Amino acid sequence: MGASGSKKHSRPPRGLQERLLRARAGACGGYWNESGGEYSRFQEGSDREQKSPSCEGRQYQQGDFMNTPWKDPAAEREKNLYRQQNMDDVDSDDDDQVRVSVTPKVPLRPMTHRLAIDMSHLIKTRGGLEGMFYSERRHKILNIYLEKEEGIIADWQNYTHGPGVRYPMFFGWLWKLVPVDVPQEGEDTETHCLVHPAQTSKFDDPHGETLVWEFDPLLAYSYEAFIRYPEEFGHKSGLPEEEWKARLKARGIPFS
């Protein structure tokens, strides 16, 4: 109700794929092209796909971006600074980045095996996560999207520790994380797109691997995470406590 033009029209909701592409990538969001062994990027405001081992043509100066993981200072410090800035940014502008309703559109519900399968296929048909670089920020955006749009409580998305392929620990989620080798040309210069997820993904991973999402329909029937790494489920593994703790310790995985 009220006079015409008195209400401010909100921007139409974007799809999950676009939200994830815009996360931390700026104008350099992209995918891993497995067949070509390269990643593809999409310029903001354009549907044109560009293939490149780096984001050429964009000049960056140190200090332009608080979140840019520069080579100096030391690698460990830059990793920690990147992670902290990444999480600060996630907390500060989630609503602007994800652009979903503040409250869930449907009643909250826990993730189930059937629901995880359905959501996996739904995401795939809507453009999907296939070949998209994984990051902590995109992980959180996916959680927020499914909670606000589908009412799914965000306590389900976990993956095995690694290194190597990371299998979903929730049975029925059909997206696993696969490490890829990203071309290293230009990594020691300041002219490539240092904020591209292909460059920053490794800072989010304890093993320094660059990961991409990959759809695997067989995960609907085979609980690979539990079969391969039961110790990561702790008391739920069915193993004696001494055994699963010993396995975690041998793999260098902290436990309480």
UniProtKB/Swiss-Prot annotation:
> Motif PxxP located where?
104-107
Q: Which GO terms describe its cellular component?
A: host cell plasma membrane; membrane
Keyword RNA-binding appears in the UniProt entry: no
Q: Where in the cell is it found?
A: Host cell membrane
Chief place of localization: host cell
Does the UniProt entry include the keyword Membrane?
Answer: yes
Region annotation (Mediates dimerization) ranges: 140-156
How is it placed in the membrane, per its record? Answer: Lipid-anchor
List the coiled-coil residues: none
Q: Could you say which residues form the signal peptide? A: none
For region Disordered, the annotated ranges are: 36-71
Kindly list the residues that the UniProt entry marks as N-myristoyl glycine lipid attachment points.
G2
Keywords from UniProt, A to Z, are: AIDS, Host cell membrane, Host membrane, Host-virus interaction, Lipoprotein, Membrane, Myristate, Viral immunoevasion, Virulence
Stretches the record annotates as Acidic: 88-96
The molecular function terms in GO held by this entry are: GTP binding
Q: How does it assemble?
A: Homodimer. Interacts with host CD247/TCRZ; this interaction induces down-regulation of cell surface TCR/CD3 complexes.
Give the protein's biological function.
Factor of infectivity and pathogenicity, required for optimal virus replication. Alters numerous pathways of T-lymphocyte function and down-regulates immunity surface molecules in order to evade host defense and increase viral infectivity. Alters the functionality of other immunity cells, like dendritic cells, monocytes/macrophages and NK cells. One of the earliest and most abundantly expressed viral proteins. In infected CD4(+) T-lymphocytes, down-regulates cell surface expression of CD4, CD28, CD3, and MHC-I or MHC-II molecules.
Family membership noted in the UniProt record? Belongs to the lentivirus primate group Nef protein family.
- Give the domain note: The N-terminal domain is composed of the N-myristoyl glycine and of a cluster of positively charged amino acids. It is required for inner plasma membrane targeting of Nef and virion incorporation, and thereby for infectivity.
Instruction: Identify this protein by name.
Output: Protein Nef
Species annotation: Human immunodeficiency virus type 2 subtype A (isolate ROD) (HIV-2)
